[in-house]
Amino acid sequence: MVQIRRGVKEDCPRLLELITELAIYEKAPNEVTVSLEHFTESGFGKNPVWWAFVAEENGIIPGFGLYYIRYSTWKGQRMYLEDIIVTEEARGRGIGKLLMDRLIEEAKEKKFSGMMWQVLEWNEPAINFYKKYYNANFDPEWINCMLSKDQLMQLSR
């Protein structure tokens, strides 16, 4: 039976494996550059910036959901769901829904003003999941912007 629990420091190597698996699925295998040390410190160091729930079954972690707190000047603190990952072989068994339901409970418990996340426009299974179970709003008006570390370093002061 699948149990949902809070992630612990010892889960980090497995979580990073799953993150790499997701990057391959999302056609970006070389984009995962975070080290295990940095990842672990960021979640379990003196000032954690992310939190996770893991799905565990018979000592194996087939999935997890990771979030951080985002601040909106209009709405206050919101949960930002960075990743919800379930291994390909474990999909279709309700693990994603168990994780998402637990994340929703966390958002309620922490009194966040809402939840936000992104989904790739071609990822139909994920889009259908969020529509089917959660009637999520999809906002086509906003465009994601970013600067890479290299771009930041190249910008003059």
Language model feature labels by segment:
Residues Q3-L15:
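A short beta-loop-alpha structural element at the N-terminal edge
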Residues L16-E41:
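Conserved GNAT-fold acetyl-CoA-binding loop/helix
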Residues S42-V54:
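A short helix-loop-beta-strand connector motif used in the catalytic cores of GNAT acetyltransferases and
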Residues V54, I60-Y68:
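Conserved beta-strand in the GNAT
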Residues G92-E105, K132:
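Conserved acetyl-CoA-binding loop-helix of GNAT-fold acetyltransferases
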Residues K97, E121-P140:
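Conserved active-site alpha-helix within GNAT-family acetyltransferase domains
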Residues K108-Q118:
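Conserved GNAT acetyl-CoA-binding A-motif
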Residues W117-A126, M146-S148:
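Conserved beta-strand-loop-alpha-helix junction that forms the acyl-donor binding cleft
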